[in-house]
Structure formats: structure tokens, C-alpha cells
Amino acid sequence: MNIRELKNANDVKMYLDSVNSHYVKVAITDIDGVLRGKYMHRDKFLKATESGFGFCDVIFGWDSNDELYELRNVSEDELFTGWHTGFPDVKTSIVVESGRLNPFEENIPFFLAELSDEEVCPRGILNKILGLMENEGIKSKSAFEYEFFLFDETPHSVREKKFSNLKNFTPGMYGYSILRNSVHSDLYNKLLNLCAEMDLPLEGLHTETGPGVIEAAIMVDHSINAADKAVLFKTFSKVLFQKNDQMANFMAKWSDKYPGQSGHIHASLQDLDGQSLFSTKEEALPKTLLYFVGGLQKYMREFAVMIAPTVNSYKRLCPGAWAPINMTWGIENRTTAFRVIQ
């Protein structure tokens, strides 16, 4: 039985029996896109596939450094969690169809979970939005693309160095280098194979401009699956590199001395029959596409909360940094905020 073909609780039980798994790893995506989770005994996990389980709601109230968010001009009654609530468990559902092999842990499958009834769960919110779109006869596909610096450092060594004078994986500026990805083909192939084994295959992988910079483009999928794959890639690529005594850094601008790093979201809309709404034989730029771009422009300020969520994000958003600083769009134009691909 293929773990990627599980559809219900009975399928999960049959699979766990077939691979003799006593424990399962479960993770939830928090509001910063970080996977938070734990090991679960198979008996508890199997019950959870049918009736859900409780998970501490603090993961939707603290930041990536486990500090509680402090929101100005917001009353306690408006906050989802905090000292005033006592940080209770909230009902969480296993996403059965998200099951994957975990290449780093034999016989311990990996599953995602979500808070379907709460408006603070990123995956739950996305599912809700996709459902509203489908009611209007629209489906969407997406793909994520990440750039990251790779260092020959460990979580301990970067702290000992006070996050300065870090050793880059490779020196100098050399985008799209065949030389470098051939010299270091073992590591590149480890990443390619990891992604293939976890069913988040890469469409492309290459060096980017900067010392030790790598760019990975994840293959297109339905938007909920694409979002899952994006989170999984960031987490498990870091696992791979740390096991190799290296660190991947996805910060927007870790140093003023080097280029910044981007995360690109590729998006498209289709009708319920799978026909593209962004291209027709009659129109080079259909109205649906133009309205889509216009909507992105209109709400760009609000989107910035998600696209540029940290102070560091704005160190990247400056002229000449290959990052958009206004709400422009263009056809095959990499200098704009929104690039229409033909």
C-alpha cells in the first residue's frame, strides 16, 4: 500500500499494520509557516484519524522564537490565545491524504494536521478559501520557488560567531553554475532525492547569484498541496543540511554585503474542467487574468503582512535589490511585483 494513496482512517490502519509502525510523526503549520509537532503512539494516532485530537493552542500565539505576540490596540477578548485563556488544547484533525515517508526515520510515517474550525490555522484558512472559489466554479494551482544561502556552519557555531563571519558553502557570485553543482553533485542529488521520496519533486534546482546561494523550484500542484509542499521543503531541506553539518538560511536579507533571497509564488486559475482562465485563443490577456492582477495590486498592502512578515523583510525591499518596491506588473518582466508569464 502506498502511503500517498491513503483516503480514510481504515486505509491508515492497514498501512501502519503493513509497515509495522509503532509511532507516527504529526505536524501542524503555525502562523509563521513553521511546522510544530510531535511523535504519537499509533493507537492514539489511529483514534485521532477518526475523532481528532487536542493540541496546545500556544503555537498560534507565539512567534518563531516562541515569544508571545504582543498586538497593539487589540483587547484580550480579540486574541485567540494568551495568558488570559490558559493555553488550552484545541481540536485538531489529521490530514490523512498528507501521509508521507520520512526518509530520516525508518518506519515512522509523517502526517500533517490542521485546525479546521479555527480561523487562525493557515491550512484551514486556505482550505476555506479554495472551497469558496470552487463554489464559484474556479480552481487554482500554485508552485513555490525558494532561494536560500547555505553555510558550512551549525546552529551552535553561528551563535558562537555571533552570526557574523560565517563560512559560505561556496565562494563568490556564480548563478546557474554547472561547475559548482557538478563539483557538489552528491549534495545536490541528496536534496533532489529527498524531495522525490517525500513527494514534493523539484522542477528545477540551481545555484543563484551569491556565495553558497541555491534556488529550488517545487513542481506545480493544486494550491493546498502546493502550500503543504512549500512548508515541507523548507523544514526537511534544513534537516538534510543540518545532518550534513550545514545550515540553510531563508532570510530575506541576512547581510548587507550579499544579495537578498526571494520566495516566489506562481499561481494560475482554472475552471472546474481544468481549462485555464488565464489564457484563451481569443484573447492574449483575458479579463480574468487582468482582474486577478488588479486584485493583487489593490490588496498588496494587506498581502505584505504575509509576504513580508518580519523587519528583515524590509531590508530587502529597496531599489536595485531585485525585489519589488511598488505595485507594478508586466509581461515576462522580472523587475515588477507581478510577472505575467506567457
Name each model feature, range by range.
Residues 7, 124, 128, 186, ...:
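Generic recognition of stable, solvent-exposed alpha-helical segments in well-folded globular domains
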Residues 100-107, 140-141, 205-209, 258, ...:
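Short glycine/proline-enriched loop/turn "hinge" motifs that connect secondary-structure elements
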Residues 179-187, 204-210, 222-233, 237, ...:
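Short, contiguous, pocket-lining structural segments
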Residues 217-223, 242-342:
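Loop-rich catalytic cores of soluble enzymes, especially ATP-dependent carboxylate-amine ligases
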Residues 1-204, 226:
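ATP/Mg2+-dependent ligation/transfer catalytic cores
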Residues 178-184, 188-202, 216-223, 234-250, ...:
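Accessory "access/gating" subregions that flank catalytic or transport cores
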Residues 141-152, 161-178, 198-218, 248-266, ...:
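Core alpha/beta catalytic barrel or barrel-like domain that forms the active/cofactor pocket
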